[in-house]
Amino acid sequence: MKQALMKAGSVAVIIGCIGAYIMAPAERDVLESYRSKRDFDKTNEPKGKIDKKKREEAIFVIQQHDASSMHYDFRLEIDGVLKSWAIPKGPSTNPHDKHLAIETEDHPIEYAEFEGVIPEGQYGAGPVLIWDTGTYEDLKEMQGKDISMADMYKNGKIEVFLRGTKLEGAYALIKTKGMGENKWLFFKMNDEYADSSKNIIKSRPESVKSGKTIDSLRID
C-alpha cells in the first residue's frame, strides 16, 4: 500500500512537471510575432526577451518612425514586454485631440533604447527616433483603486501618468468599439499639464537620446 501511494505521488509530480512544461511555451511565445518579422542578421533591432524583472518604475517610450508612412509608436512596459501602438498623428497635449492608435505586436523591453535606421527590405524599413521616454504610473493605482495594468489592458481602458522629457501628466488609451479589433484612441486627459495652445510634435521634433531629427537620422 505504501509503495502504491509513493508511486501515485511520483506520477502526480511527473504530471505536474509536464503540465508546467506545456504551459510555459505560451509565455515564451509572446514575442514570437515580433521576432518572426525580422532578420536579426540584417537589422540592429534587439532580438530581446521577456523581462519580468521588478523595477521601481515602469517605463514608456515614444518612437517616431518613418516607414511606409510617418507615425509615432507608443510603448508601455506591461508584464515584461512593451505593449505597442502606432499613432499616425502622434501624441498631443490637447485633451480635445483624440488620436487613432493601432495596436501592433509586443516588443522587447530593450527596444525602448533602439534608435537608428532599419535597413531596406526589412520589416518597418526606415529611421526610428526616440522622440520621448521616461517612466509612468498606473493612474488607477495612484487614485487608490486596485486594478493592474494587465487588467486595464484586457479591459481596453488604460489610464497612466507619464513622466517623460516632453510629455507629462495623465494620458488614456481607450479601445474603440465598431472600428476594428486593434484600434484604440490615445489622448491627453484634463489636468494641470494639459495645453491646447501648442503643437508638441512641431515644437519638439528632436530625439531625447541624440538630439537629432528624423531627417538627420536618415542622412546619417
Label for each model-derived stretch:
Residues 22-220:
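A charge-rich, low-complexity, intrinsically flexible signal that marks solvent-exposed coils, linkers
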Residues 5-13:
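Sec-dependent signal peptide hydrophobic core
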Residues 1-3:
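N-terminal secretory signal peptides that target proteins for export/translocation
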Residues 14-22:
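Hydrophobic alpha-helical membrane-insertion segments, chiefly the h-region
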